[in-house]
Amino acid sequence: MTTLTRGNRPTLLRLASALLVGALLAFGARAATDDMHILIGSYTHDSDSPGILRLRFDHKTGQIDPKPVQTLASDNPSWLVLDEERGRLYATNENGPAHEDPVGRVSAWQLDSTGDHQLIGQNISLGDEPTHASLSHDGRYLFISNYGSRPNPGGSLAVMPLAEDGHPLPVTQMLAHQSSGVHPERQQSAHVHSAVPSPDGKRLLVSDLGADRVFVYRYDPRQAERPLQPDEPASIELPAGSGPRHLVFHPNGKHAYLALELSAQVASFDYTNGTLTRRQLLDLKEAGSDVRHSPGAIHTSADGRFLYVSDRGDYNHIIVFAIEADGTLREIQRRSSEGREPREFAITPDGRFMLIANQLSDELVVLRRDAGSGELGETLQTLPAGRPSDIKLLAPN
């Protein structure tokens, strides 16, 4: 045992000073990680938004700093795709016949930890209103959903190769579904709304709102010009007039969940090697209500215990489901989005907060979330933002 005497007090002081400095440095390192960055896509044609906002989010307090770290000028960058492995950001420029610039495009930026993003390049999507995109697991292609509001030619799926530096190259493959549905206004032709790679990356599942089908394609990058080919079976048929919008896989890869926009329903499936087997078809409309519902975004929690669906229209709620052990759903909560048209939302990696993009009320909303129960709690912040349409989270610096 060491005995402390007056003679070694200088040593003690030096030791205490060193410990204090170390503690301050450690505190500073922790404080630096308290902030994460969020990226906000938007519609610029009917708002004052400049394009994409990069904002700082304090994931200790749940507060967004209203002063942007950076703004990226871009036309209608409604959907964002992050490739954090390669440090890139892609956006669909959802232009179409109703806009001043009618040409749908995809834009790409190189991400910089300082917030100084550099535009890599752009290319056209060969279709109207590219509303969604996803990245192949190997990072070689973007799969672009051209919604195509005009019945002729309607929607399409575009396959866009990416150069080694991330530059979007000309589209090499176009896939159009010659189909329509029963809805007199929304289903006169195919309207591709999203395309999602399977958990193993070997297939692409394409939700076509106009066709009432989810089309399944095999992905083979060895066929560089035409990497997608119809699977067998080539599609999964859904109830007439249901309007499939977005599909999400459970983290275990064994289940999938689909938002049906036109019928205001959520479907749950078992998934095996490209085959979706439907387990449930759940109504979001409350019995006897004439309120207009319109499900939009759909995401699971990172732990796979809960599913969240944004319900727009006149309802404007987030609907929370518990995911049972067999993958089926049980509704547990309906929580106001505190705004109009909750087009997208994101849950922070620690599960403590949900960030909502309320498109038509021009605002971002932060809700507290209970990671244990999955329920959404108090409203922590409401922040003005022009026509927000998507939210993506960047890892803390």
Residue positions per predicted region:
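Beta-rich, blade/repeat-based domains predominating
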Residues: 48, 74-85, 128-137, 149, ...
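Short glycine/acidic-enriched loop and turn motifs that connect beta-strands
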Residues: 44-47, 95-99, 148-152, 211-213, ...
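Blade-loop segments of beta-propeller domains
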Residues: 66-137
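A short beta-strand motif characteristic of beta-propeller blades
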Residues: 66-72, 118-123, 179-185, 231-237, ...
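Short loop/turn segments immediately following beta-strands, especially the blade-tip
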Residues: 56-62, 109-115, 159-169, 218-227, ...
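Asp-box/WD-like beta-propeller blade repeats and closely related beta-sheet repeat scaffolds
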Residues: 116-194
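Bacterial N-terminal signal peptides
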Residues: 16-26
